[in-house]
Amino acid sequence: MKNIELLNNKKNTYFLSIGGIGEIGGNNYLYSFKGEQVIVDGGISFADDSLPGVDITIPDPYIFLNSNIKPKAMILTHAHEDHVGGLEYYFDKIDFPIYCNQFTFSYIKHKFNKIAGYEKKFIIIDNFQEIEFENFSFQLIPTTHSIPDPTGIFFTTLEGNIYHTGDWKIDKNPVTGSPFDYQNYQLLKDEKIDLLIGDSTNAGVNEISRSESELDPSFGKLFKKLNGRIVVTCFSSNI
């Protein structure tokens, strides 16, 4: 990246997509708040036919591992591979804390259990718990998605408030976890958001995203009709 030293500028706020914008997967972002940096997510992308023999790719972590950029922390929004799957490839080089909620940690910790003391790099926090640094603070804001306990991130900075949505959809009856809580977003409205960094996957589709729980009655009817073995396939991120 050219002018990487701009990220150490103590006068301005910067947002950099290392991966995840203009593509599906590879979510990896960097915020710089007057010279204090924080990384959001560290995902993988699934390779397509243009890369024969390659299964996955990861955004280049050079910017925050091998340059003059020294992040204060990494924050994980949820446990899907396109947001956390890259960590295992450079986990040993991370020398800053990784913040996430309990479910996300419980789901991904198996990736690192062969590394002695891996848990010391993680800091488990609650939703709405404020974590403060010199030039910014943040809170995890619960939302709904196709995995339990996903979150967005609300940043409070010296120059304004930023909301990073993470992956989300409005699900009033999720298979697991709490339903989408409109009150949480009313609170964000009251705080005033100066900048929104938002997930836009399928935003151009003019339809309502239905809840996965709507499949339950159909599955029940089908299973009652069958007497033999039943094999059900599902998307790889389903739990």
Where are these regions (language model features)?
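His/Asp/Glu-rich metal-coordinating catalytic cores
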Residues: 2-75, 80-239
